[in-house]
């Protein structure tokens, strides 16, 4: 077992077209070894209707941002020092993607998280 001061607790959120996943883990600074503390996955259907309308559906955005706030609270209560948030297709392609990104920034403001909207290749 690593010495406690060698560990850093972090969170990572993967927000896709249909689900949003959370990983909170301890990383050993010396070895890079990762130990899961919490894993969650919820279906939010963020991409519902985006192909048809070109926009994130208001209910889908509300569901996803509510789960983002819940995940941020869990990261805080578990002592995460930072959180990385990566979002994919729906948040990249939608006309109202900026509204979604602003909501995520607000949800994770205590961590200074800037959501990363990754390319299709990433």
Model-derived features with residue positions:
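Nucleotide/phosphate-binding catalytic cleft detector across ATP-hydrolyzing
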Residues: 1-15, 23-122
């Amino acid at each position: 077992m690593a010495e406690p001061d060698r560990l850093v607790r972090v969170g990572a959120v993967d927000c896709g077209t249909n689900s949003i996943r959370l990983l909170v883990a301890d990383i050993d600074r010396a070895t890079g070894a990762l130990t899961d503390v919490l894993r969650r996955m919820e279906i939010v259907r963020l991409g519902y209707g985006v192909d048809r309308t070109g926009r994130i559906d208001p209910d889908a955005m509300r569901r996803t941002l509510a789960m983002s706030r819940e995940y941020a609270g869990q990261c805080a209560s578990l002592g995460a020092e930072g959180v990385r948030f990566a979002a994919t297709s729906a948040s990249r392609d939608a006309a109202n993607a900026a509204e979604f990104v602003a909501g995520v920034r607000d949800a994770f403001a205590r961590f200074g998280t800037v959501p990363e909207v990754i390319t299709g290749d990433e």
